[in-house]
Amino acid sequence: MLKGTYIYYQDGQEIYRSSNVITKYGKRFLTSFLAGRDSFTSKSMSFGIDSTSAQDTDTRMGFEFYRTPVLFGSTDIQTVNDTTTYAVVYKATIPQDVAGYITEVGIYPEFKDSLTSYDSKFIADFDNQLDWTNTPLITSTNARVGQYLLTMSSNGTSAKEYKSNIQAIDLSGYSVNDTLKLAYVKNDANLQNIIIKFYSSALDYYSVTVTPNAGTGYKLSSDIKLDNLFSNASTLNVDPSNINQIGITITPTSGQSTSVGLDALRINDEDTFNPNFGLISRSVLTTPLVKLAGRQVDVEYRLDLGF
């Protein structure tokens, strides 16, 4: 029986460990690897902020914010009182400059394996107020992706839009089944919705409306299919291959004012099938691990082999 555990170290001392679920893909992949059909020479560890329980049907992380190559692998064979245990150990490092609130970790068979450039990626991490119009407030309170998030407010009782110029991204190769996901902080009960816009020019954009989750506090939106984005264009002239600006509109409920903390926005490639790439294992931490900037954390994935 295979048993996987992630072990976290800081300054050489163990600070946490969490057990994993090996996914259905992972079981197939490891079986093929033992049969010599698949390569496992390159690996990567992924870290995220979603706390949804791990299932063997997971195909990706809930909300990944950092991925790093596995530095090396080794074996650990020990005999105690005539009982021998066998394990494979993979190690990776989260460097000093990365900060985040780790609630999930996973391992993939390769660091980067995409059949096209239209893979899962970050679109915005909301860590620099100077990148946005209307001067949102910057704060470290409740930030989970990086050190900071931006607080965007309504214009009193009216909606207010914040815009940021970005390096052009190409959405033309994503399908209607791919998804967007937003990480945000709902500060009060007066939020009606958040509208995300993708501009190719000042008048030409796609938009999608995010209905806020119930309650206040840190939230992850549901998966937003790109079908909902592409079907809502301001004109017929939107160029999906040249999205160069993002807009975030904060809309309060009638007669109220509101504010929202924006933490991260990413796009997930949901339907590009590659039999050699997928989530092998996922672990959800019972207690979140706060990774501070300036401190390196080493992570070990130990796969015990029940021979």
Label the predicted regions:
Residues A92, L182-Y184, I196, I248, ...:
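Preference for bulky hydrophobic residues occupying beta-strand positions
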Residues T103, N242-I246:
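Exposed beta-strand face motif in extracellular beta-rich ectodomains
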Residues D119-L130, S164-L171:
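Beta-sheet-rich sandwich/jelly-roll-like modules and their strand-loop junctions
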Residues G156-T235, N242, G255-G261, R266-E270:
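Extracellular ligand-binding interfaces
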Residues G247-Q256:
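Short beta-strand-plus-loop segments that form exposed binding edges in beta-rich domains
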